A protein has these predicted regions:
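A composition-driven surface/loop motif
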Residues: 1-149
């Protein structure tokens, strides 16, 4: 299962759990909050894609990655001179673009983590409410059963 499938599965589970809450307004509010969080998560994925496209526009990442692999191979063999010579071939614009992208990506990941934490808090609250409603329902059922006896 990839990340998207896992998120989709969690989304379905959360919606089912939300549907178990008896208080209609609370159920509606929680469902709307959950939808908003899901949209924010989707927007995050699209933001990262856009940032990546802009950051690496006109840059040959494959060539850069091949050169980095050669540098690492030379270093692992202990050939520091060859590694240094290969490092001189690195395009400074590509290196800067990668650093800039990594900084932006890290910022976005922090935002995504905050979204996920809120989502988890919401899911935990929803689960607790559903359990509480279920417990109340069981109590009501037991009361009715004892009255009928």
């Amino acid at each position: 299962m990839n990340t998207r499938e896992i998120k989709d599965t969690l989304s379905i589970i959360s919606r089912v759990t939300i549907s178990k809450i008896a208080d209609k307004q609370l159920r509606k509010d929680l469902f709307n909050d959950y939808l908003a969080l899901s949209k924010a998560s989707k927007a995050f994925d699209e933001d990262i894609k856009t940032i990546q496209e802009k950051a690496f526009e006109g840059i040959d990442l494959n060539a850069h990655n091949e050169l980095v692999a050669k540098i690492r191979k030379a270093e692992s063999k202990g050939d520091i001179e060859q590694a240094e010579n290969l490092a001189k071939e690195l395009n400074p614009d590509t290196v800067k673009a990668i650093r800039d992208f990594n900084e932006l990506y890290e910022e976005k990941m922090n935002e995504e983590q905050e979204i996920e934490l809120v989502k988890i808090d919401t899911e935990t609250f929803v689960d607790a409410m559903a359990e509480q409603d279920f417990a109340i329902s069981m109590q009501e059922l037991e009361t009715l059963t004892s009255i009928l006896k």
